[in-house]
Each structure stands twice: as C-alpha cells, then as structure tokens.
Design a protein with these regions (language model features):
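Short intrinsically disordered terminal tails
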Residues: 1, 46, 102-103
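Short terminal alpha-helical segments
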Residues: 1-35, 87, 91-96
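Context-gated lysine
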Residues: 5, 14, 43, 55-58, ...
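Amphipathic alpha-helical interaction modules
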Residues: 17-64
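Amphipathic alpha-helical binding modules
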Residues: 63-103
Length: 103
C-alpha cells in the first residue's frame, strides 16, 4: 500500500512549519490537524496500533518543531510503526506550540 495521502498531509504540515519564521496560531493549528489526520490514515489503512504513543510534550519551541518535522522522510520509511511514532511526536510538539500561542 502506498503512503501518498500520508505524504501529502506531512508535506502540508512541513510547509507550514518549515517555511515560516514565526507561524501564527491558526497556521500551527492547520499543521497539527494535518499531522493528526496523517496519523489516523496510517493507523486505519495499515492496521497499526500496538505501541503506545510517546509521552506528551510539555513545552516546545519552533526550532525543535522544525528539526523534528524536517527529519520526517516517508520515502525511506519502511517501518510503519516507527513512522507512526515519529508522526505522533511531531504532532505533540506542534500541539505544544499551539498551546504556547494561547498564553
């Protein structure tokens, strides 16, 4: 099975996070939703769950988010469980960024 939809969603989140020096709350929320949808698509299409999600991130900065999301590479990812874990970690970092914009 291909990962076209997941790839498209991850690229959407990457473009929001990587191309902006200071993304606003709405843009970060869009990136979060794209990552969440990619996670759901990957889980449902490939029947993945098994491993528990990573511990929630308490605080994050834009540099960490850019670093994590920049390392996502779906074309070389043959281990879908690792990809799911990485997507969840990126999602949690973006979620922490959205929360920090509320303060």
């Amino acid at each position: 099975m291909s990962l076209e939809k997941v790839d498209r969603l991850v690229e959407q989140a990457k473009s929001i996070i990587l191309e902006s020096s200071n993304p606003d709350r709405t843009s970060l929320w869009r990136a979060y939703v794209a990552l969440e949808y990619a996670i759901l698509d990957l889980k449902l299409r490939h029947g993945l769950e098994g491993n528990p999600p990573p511990k929630p991130v308490k605080s994050a900065d834009l540099v960490t988010a850019k670093s994590m999301i920049g390392r996502l590479n779906l074309s070389s990812s043959s281990d879908k469980k690792k990809l799911l874990y990485d997507l969840r970690l990126c999602r949690d970092i973006v979620k922490a960024l959205v929360a920090s914009k509320l303060r």
